[in-house]
Every structure is written in structure tokens, then in C-alpha cells.
Regions:
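Accessory "access/gating" subregions that flank catalytic or transport cores
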Residues: 106-110
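Proline/glycine-rich low-complexity loops and linkers
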Residues: 8-12, 16-34, 126-198
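Short, glycine/acidic-enriched loop or turn micro-motifs at the edges of active sites
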Residues: 57, 116-120, 128
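Short, exposed "boundary/linker" segments that immediately precede the start
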Residues: 1-4
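Gly/Ser/Thr-enriched, mixed-charge loops and adjacent short helices
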Residues: 8-12, 16-104
Length: 199
């Protein structure tokens, strides 16, 4: 008898009006595009830039090209035809050679290769050279004139290049290593009160 009561209660718990509901927000992409554009300083212009952008047939295949186009760049997009199976397949940040080729072929100013869920990026310079996480962090650190308070240190990981660490210290930054993974980098950034970290 107790099994019967339990099953009846389980069925009652699964009544449709008691379940959560999924909703599609069609304007969410537009809102995200506007947010991203709002983070670009007003004195930074993308006009006249030609960018090759590989979206890895993933989550960013619509919004990323739109962001750069709306900022004024000419965007040559690849990896923007997801079919549910081809995410990261021979494209994106794990296969940047396509972007490297296109940057040279299209005479682009630079290239961007994302991964399928949009949380990893590598850059390609106009000569087709790959810039990985350490390179990108160094460029950001070098360009930053404020090296105090939240900008006084940088978080890398156990995978960060020792040459990168030495170069960062020569710029006057403190440097600490977190365990591998964006979660660990984020946690250490919060703990230290710093703004820049990556892997």
C-alpha cells in the first residue's frame, strides 16, 4: 500500500502546471550584442578593420559576427553553419589554421577563433601568427597604464609559460598561478581582488 501512495505522489509531482517552464527570449541575442558593444570605449573604432572570425559552428555563430559588424568592422565569418554535429569540427580555436589561412588570403587586419561554447579564444595577427592565451594576456598587460590596485597582478595557471611569467614581472605586475581551468582562475582573481587572468 505504501508503494501505491508513493507512486501516486510522484505522479502528482509531475503534473504539468507544477513543472518549470522553458521560455525562448528572441531578443536575448540583441540584448547581449548591445551589452558587448557597451564595453568598448567610445574612442576605440573598428571602422576600416577587416576581421576573419571563426565561430566553430557553435554558440556564438550569430552574435559574434553581429557584434563586430555593428562596431563597424568588415567581418569575414567562417564556422557559422552549425548542424548539431559539427561544433568544433576542424574549426575554431582548436583548429586555428583555417583562420590563419583566411587572414592571409583576405589580407585581414587580424583573426579571431572561438571555441564552440565561446569561452576560449585565440587571435591571429595580420601575418597569420597565432596568439594564444599567454600572448593575449601580455598584450593586455602591456597596454594597461594602470598597474595598481585591482590591476597590480595577473593570474595564470600551471600551464602558463615561464617566459610569460618573467615578462609580466618585468612590466611590474605580481603573478600567481591557479590550477588549470577557468573556474580556478576566476576564484583566484576574486581572492586576490585582481582583474586580469586567463589560461
Amino acid at each position: 500500500r505504501s508503494k501505491h501512495v508513493l507512486r501516486r505522489r510522484q505522479r502528482q509531482m509531475c503534473i504539468r502546471d507544477r513543472l518549470g517552464k522553458a521560455q525562448r527570449f528572441d531578443e536575448s541575442g540583441d540584448r547581449y550584442i548591445e551589452f558587448c558593444k557597451s564595453t568598448v570605449p567610445p574612442d576605440v573604432s573598428f571602422d576600416s578593420l577587416r576581421i576573419v572570425l571563426d565561430c566553430a559552428n557553435g554558440a556564438c555563430y550569430k552574435v559574434s559576427p553581429s557584434i563586430f559588424r555593428e562596431l563597424g568592422a568588415e567581418v569575414i565569418s567562417i564556422g557559422t553553419e552549425p548542424d548539431g554535429y559539427n561544433i568544433n569540427y576542424e574549426c575554431g580555436s582548436t583548429h586555428p589554421e583555417k583562420v590563419q589561412e583566411e587572414v592571409i588570403k583576405q589580407r585581414a587586419d587580424f583573426g579571431i577563433a572561438l571555441d564552440g561554447d565561446g569561452d576560449r579564444v585565440v587571435l591571429i595577427d595580420r601575418k597569420g601568427c597565432l596568439l594564444d592565451g599567454d600572448d593575449i594576456m601580455y598584450i593586455l598587460a602591456y597596454a594597461n597604464p594602470n598597474r595598481t590596485g585591482p590591476w597590480s597582478g595577473i593570474i595564470g595557471t600551471a600551464m602558463s609559460n615561464f617566459g610569460f611569467e618573467e615578462a609580466i614581472k618585468k612590466l611590474g605586475y605580481k603573478f600567481k598561478r591557479a590550477d588549470v581551468g577557468d573556474k580556478h582562475v576566476s576564484q583566484m582573481l576574486k581572492k586576490e581582488g585582481w582583474m586580469l587572468g586567463g589560461e
